[in-house]
Amino acid sequence: MPPTRFQPSHQTPFKSTISTSQQSRIFHSPLQAGATANPVSISISDIDPSEWKYHAEGGKNVLLSFDPVGGIQAGKSPFATLTCTYALRIPKSLPSKSESNQEDEQEAEQFTRHVVQPLLGDATVLPKCMRIPIVTARDRHVIDMLSARIEMQRPAARRTHPARIRSEALSYIYAVEDVAAPVSVSPSAQRAVLCVEIKPKWGFLARIDSIPPSSPNVEIKARYSRYRMHRVAKHAAADHAGQMSIEQFERLYDPVDLYSCDSERKQKAIKALWDDWIDTKGKTNNLRLFWNGAVVDPQDSVTLEAIAQFLGTDNSVQGRLKGALTQHLDKELSKRVLGENDEWSTVSVLSRLAHLQSALDPLDVEGLAHLWLRRTQSHVLGQASSDVDLPPALTRNLAAAQLAAMLDSFLSGTTAEVSLEDAVQAFLVSASFKDCSMLLRFHQTESGVQGETKLVDLDSKPFAKLSSMQQTDSEVCAAFLAWLSQLDRSPAASVAP
């Protein structure tokens, strides 16, 4: 059967940087060290397990922060320099992977080098990162000691899952820039740092023409942001008494407001994130604050007052800290720092993210599943009968080097037709940008509070996740339609950025 074709019907706001981007000589997540102004060499022998503590973890990695006795002093350790303090990122693995997963680690690096960096257009928006080889039995013993040291600090749900640090499966770990750590200004002095983590989510609304006309979800996907619909679904599935009200829904954080170029809408989104952070006592997944590397509890009045003073305001007056933080976040999120093909023009990080998310997902998961059904006779995206002969692009993730050339057609507008194979692979890349996090770091300078933005959690999404993405989409839409059917009026729609 010949490849199924579709024809994109949208305009792209700027061209891809796949072919023209220049790779930075500074090493960035997660790449081998290159030529730098201040080269640093780090090995496992530099790691003292007693100097590290658990910081966070995701599905693939555990993050440890540097916490030596007496505090961090630049120059005393290769993990703390005048230009950067490093954390450790250690990949997790399952019991079945007792052998080294070196190929997986190398492909992850290639995904960043050949896909993520060129698409973003500027490698410096990614945290610095160095590969630390694991070679000897002693190296593995150090990893085992680190793992044992932090095991009981991990959340219970993570400890019960079989994925964990397994030294026998590691070829490398990584020293990554700790964006939340204080800024060193001398070997013994540091400046305070406020780091705000935002998980912005999807910055676009689906186009009506991307979804099969027979779908019951056409209107809701074109009117309401995916994040808000998902919140309704989660609320319905939780043990809450009663359903979410229209008023509650309209107060929810809406990503398309954050991605908007309109300052008023952006500030509305930031305030909604703050309110959710307060209401959930810091348990929300979309906003976290770090003060000098430590996560902030919204009930910690002492730390909140220190942050307020740092931002030049007073937390004793209700709403002032929220207002000051909103202003700083709005300013930082609006900065045009990423270059386009036109060397004279730049865009904000959020604008680039929104474009990549939407341009690489022109069909929506429903449109993609519709073409998959026509091609394979399977209703489950990513799965097909064993007697159906499929090319590699419809059975697994393509290598990063292959992806790079293929993605250009989605972003440049130079190709009228794109194959199903390409659409599936581009959809997976889009999912990486939909699920990333932003780290906004603020520190004091002589001219006042200055900010910078880094992007993290940009790992490739596995091909095997396609079916669960389709299922989640179906469940979210069904729950949202059920909720709408019980209302006496329609809630206010999202407004595209």
Curated annotation (Swiss-Prot):
GO terms for biological process: inositol phosphate biosynthetic process. A motif (EXKPK motif) lies at residues 197-201. Residues 1-23 are annotated as: Disordered. One of its GO terms (molecular function) is ATP binding. It is an enzyme of class 2 (transferase). Pfam families: Ins_P5_2-kin. The keyword Nucleotide-binding applies. Keywords: ATP-binding, Kinase, Nucleotide-binding, Transferase. It catalyses: 1D-myo-inositol 1,3,4,5,6-pentakisphosphate + ATP = 1D-myo-inositol hexakisphosphate + ADP + H(+). GO terms for cellular component: nucleus. Its EC number is 2.7.1.158. It comes from the Eukaryota. The EXKPK motif is conserved in inositol-pentakisphosphate 2-kinases of both family 1 and 2. Phosphorylates Ins(1,3,4,5,6)P5 at position 2 to form Ins(1,2,3,4,5,6)P6 (InsP6 or phytate). Belongs to the IPK1 type 2 family. This is Inositol-pentakisphosphate 2-kinase. The gene is IPK1.
